[in-house]
């Protein structure tokens, strides 16, 4: 049994986007928490207004939440009691390498190298096709005492920031990480489940974004709820196949970070990935959608997921179809027809 952690932790959330802000708000309701924003003007405005007007407009943040644009100050908050601290990385996949590289230089100097650390991003790094844990390992793996994991699950940041109920999974081989996240966030509105399957949790979080784009395209084409249900179910099969090839536990894909996150992202009105798909299905070009300011991790990581799957000889027909529509000029309806024309086969592989 893991050792119980104290009732109070010092928490630093690095990254003041919507998700980082939401988690910082949740943690600050029970623990001394600092939210680091790279943009000084944003940090100053958030501290003055107790609101992230850029990413979560209209959501009041707890008065106890501290906001700083000084990374050294945010980390110094932990250095007062490093044995009872937690670092949450709230940056997207694209921001992981630069932030982890900076932490590799700063944490040991402050005696924080063994502080439990979790990341919250979902996706594959575009240039390398790495999952987040591989990025963390590359940047921080040589740091003595590293205890790291991933926090994920079906969640929209706005609802979490508002204090509405949510269930999340923390996955790590380190009991210290699992315990720290549970202590920091588990409470009246947040339920935390623990796992050791980092790869499974990450694969689910990455591929569900791509499948959600496909579901949005389906809805944009007005193909009906039957078609969307088929995409969700067969998309889950793609996630499980990919995960199996990387050593993930299959039961993970039936849980919060697999089926749960997929259903939410593929059907929720707040899903950016689904919204991009809706626009594509309605006939808009990807370049125009992105130029309007709409972003989605499913677009960013689709090619990386496809390329890594090809290298591993994993069949991902829905992911391949999404890439063909987004990047190769294939019409959405032609992609649907190609998926429907695939050879009939058993739903589950024969043992």
Curated annotation (Swiss-Prot):
Q: Which domain of life is it from?
A: Bacteria
One biological process term from GO is: phospholipid biosynthetic process
Main location group: cytoplasm
User: What does the record give as the active site?
Assistant: 208 (proton acceptor)
NAD is among the record's keywords: yes
Which residues take part in binding sn-glycerol 3-phosphate? 122, 153, 155, 208, 261, 271-273
Extract the InterPro entries matched here.
Answer: 6-PGluconate_DH-like_C_sf (IPR008927), 6PGD_dom2 (IPR013328), G3P_DH_NAD-dep (IPR006168), G3P_DH_NAD-dep_C (IPR006109), G3P_DH_NAD-dep_N (IPR011128), NAD(P)-bd_dom_sf (IPR036291)
Q: Which residues bind NADPH?
A: 18-19, 38, 122, 157, 272, 297
Could you tell me what reaction this enzyme catalyses? sn-glycerol 3-phosphate + NAD(+) = dihydroxyacetone phosphate + NADH + H(+); sn-glycerol 3-phosphate + NADP(+) = dihydroxyacetone phosphate + NADPH + H(+)
Keyword NADP present in the record's keywords: the answer is yes
Keywords linked to the UniProt accession: Cytoplasm, Lipid biosynthesis, Lipid metabolism, NAD, NADP, Nucleotide-binding, Oxidoreductase, Phospholipid biosynthesis, Phospholipid metabolism
Protein known as:
Glycerol-3-phosphate dehydrogenase [NAD(P)+]
Q: Which GO terms describe its molecular function?
A: glycerol-3-phosphate dehydrogenase [NAD(P)+] activity; NAD binding
Pathway-wise, it operates in: Membrane lipid metabolism; glycerophospholipid metabolism
Localization, per the record, is: Cytoplasm
Tell me which PANTHER family the record gives.
Answer: GLYCEROL-3-PHOSPHATE DEHYDROGENASE, GLYCEROL-3-PHOSPHATE DEHYDROGENASE [NAD(+)] 2, CHLOROPLASTIC
What this protein is reported to do is described as: Catalyzes the reduction of the glycolytic intermediate dihydroxyacetone phosphate (DHAP) to sn-glycerol 3-phosphate (G3P), the key precursor for phospholipid synthesis.
Offer a single GO CC term for the protein.
Answer: cytosol
């Amino acid at each position: 049994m893991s050792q119980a952690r104290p009732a109070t932790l010092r928490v630093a959330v690095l990254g003041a986007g919507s998700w980082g802000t939401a988690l910082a708000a949740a943690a600050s309701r029970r623990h001394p928490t600092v939210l680091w924003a790279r943009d000084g003007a944003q940090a100053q405005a958030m501290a003055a207004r107790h609101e992230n007007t850029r990413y979560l407009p209209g959501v009041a943040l707890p008065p106890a939440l501290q906001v700083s644009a000084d990374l050294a100050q945010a980390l110094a908050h932990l250095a007062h009691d490093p044995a009872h601290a937690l670092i949450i990385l709230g940056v997207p996949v694209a921001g992981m390498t630069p932030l982890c590289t900076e932490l590799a230089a700063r944490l040991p100097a402050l005696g924080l190298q063994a502080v439990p650390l979790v990341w919250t991003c979902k996706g594959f790094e575009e240039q390398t096709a790495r999952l987040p844990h591989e990025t963390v390992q590359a940047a921080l793996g040589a740091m003595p005492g590293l205890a790291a994991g991933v926090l994920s699950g079906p969640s929209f940041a706005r609802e979490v920031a508002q204090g509405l109920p949510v269930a999340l999974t923390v996955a790590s081989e380190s009991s210290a990480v699992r315990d720290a996240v549970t202590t920091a966030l588990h409470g009246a509105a947040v339920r935390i489940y623990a796992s050791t399957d980092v790869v499974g949790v990450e694969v689910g979080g990455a591929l569900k974004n791509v499948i959600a784009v496909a579901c949005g395209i389906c809805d944009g084409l007005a193909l009906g709820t039957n078609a969307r249900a088929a995409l969700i179910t067969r998309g889950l099969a793609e996630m499980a196949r990919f995960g199996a090839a990387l050593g993930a536990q299959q039961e993970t894909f039936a849980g919060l970070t697999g089926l749960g996150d997929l259903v939410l992202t593929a059907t929720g009105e707040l899903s950016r990935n689904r919204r991009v798909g809706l626009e594509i299905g309605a006939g808009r070009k990807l370049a125009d959608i992105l130029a309007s300011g709409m972003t989605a991790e499913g677009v960013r990581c689709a090619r990386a997921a496809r390329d890594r799957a090809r290298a591993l000889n994993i069949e991902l027909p829905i992911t391949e179809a999404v890439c063909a529509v987004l990047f190769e000029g294939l019409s959405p309806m032609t992609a649907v027809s190609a998926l429907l024309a695939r050879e009939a086969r058993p739903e589950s592989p024969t043992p």
